[in-house]
Regions:
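All-alpha amphipathic helical-bundle segments outside canonical DNA-binding/catalytic cores
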Residues: 294-307
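Active-site acidic catalytic loop and adjacent metal/ATP-binding pocket
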Residues: 26-37, 41, 210-261
Length: 346
């Protein structure tokens, strides 16, 4: 349920709270989002207040420069004169006996445009036109970010450093933990064809890790180019109208990062096959930057390496999180199947 304070703010915006849209809609990421009229209402932990305020300023800048497919944030009526008018802190509206611990009595709430369109649930549903449209949209987003003030020289992307560390640990241990996790995973209700494919997938993942670890080490140690990016540009966060992009949602992972992450995350979740299949979208990405007098801050092969490394690490993580597969129809089963297919089709 929406907290009382959030309800009052929405009423002040003239929204009807009696509609069925107050039922939370669970996205592919697991986050609950309420649709009220033409707005999306989403909660965050109280501890994320300062970060949300920073993210909102960047998202507002993108929304002002890109009309239509970046959701605009709505200022809460009672906060119009505050430094962070788009971040509302509200106490949870729950019976006393059902209340959580004191440190989670409050949460942050944001209100933004509800964008139209549909998303692709599987990689097979994505069309070549959608792949190209997404790449062009990312190029537009990154061009705007490059034109913003740069972070201090010598800064590093912690996400890249962490991926490199995890990859090196897998190689040094000869993938021992994933193989042990596979034995325990056999007790979960996973389709037999998928379970039988995992040993072959692990062999392929190990070879990919061996092939990519030097390139990954170089990226982690030498690349210090960072600018604002979406941070989780996988296919579930893109909305489409036919082949065109109609929306990019969920900016909660936006940050100053190496920009190749966005393209790796997006195309890696939309294209199955070798790097050659990425060339047309890559050219569209480059064109969006060129239209603004800019060039990519990374090479296509670097983004592809990041995708391959991320796929290996995703497989290892999924094998170790057995709770994701306790339900026979868990979405994680489809995600595991997709990762296995990507690692085998190399």
């Amino acid at each position: 349920m929406l907290p009382i304070r959030v309800r009052k703010e929405l009423q002040r915006l003239g929204l009807d709270l009696q509609s069925q849209s107050l039922i939370p809609q669970t996205g592919l990421s697991g986050a609950e989002v309420y649709r009220v009229g033409n707005y999306a209402i989403k909660s965050h932990p109280l501890a994320s207040f300062d970060r949300l305020a920073i993210l909102h300023r960047q998202q507002q800048r993108w929304a002002q420069c890109v009309q239509g497919w970046i959701p605009r944030l709505q200022a809460w009526p009672s906060l119009l004169s505050s430094p962070a008018p788009t971040v509302l802190v509200a106490e949870l509206d729950a019976p006393l006996l059902q209340r959580p611990a004191a440190d989670s009595l409050y949460s942050c709430w944001e209100c933004m445009d509800w964008l139209p369109g549909i998303h692709s649930e599987t990689i097979q549903e994505v069309t070549p036109g959608q792949q190209t449209s997404v790449a062009h949209a990312l190029g537009t987003l990154h061009a705007l970010a490059q034109q913003a003030p740069s972070p201090p020289n010598g800064s590093r992307d912690d996400r890249m450093t962490e991926r490199n560390r995890l990859l090196q640990e897998l190689l040094q241990s000869n993938f021992q933990q994933p193989y042990r996790d596979l034995d325990r995973l056999a007790t979960q209700p996973i389709p037999l064809d998928l379970l039988d494919s995992i040993p072959n997938t692990l062999r392929s993942a190990k070879q990919i890790a061996l092939d990519c670890h030097r390139a990954m080490l170089k990226l982690a140690s030498q690349n210090n180019t960072r600018h604002w990016m979406h941070g989780d540009a996988w296919r579930g966060n893109w909305l489409f109208d036919a082949d065109g992009v109609s929306g990019l949602i969920d900016f909660s992972q936006a940050d100053l990062r190496w920009p190749g992450f966005d393209l790796a995350r997006a195309l890696g979740s939309m294209i199955q096959g070798p790097m050659q299949a990425w060339i047309d979208p890559w050219e569209s990405y480059c064109q969006a930057l060129s239209d603004r007098g800019l060039q990519p801050a990374f090479r296509l092969d670097e983004a592809y390496v990041m995708h391959r490394v991320s796929s290996v690490l995703t497989l290892a993580r999924y094998l170790g999180e057995h709770h994701l597969f306790v339900a026979p129809n868990s979405p994680s089963i489809n995600r595991l199947r997709e990762v296995c297919q990507q690692l085998i089709d190399r």
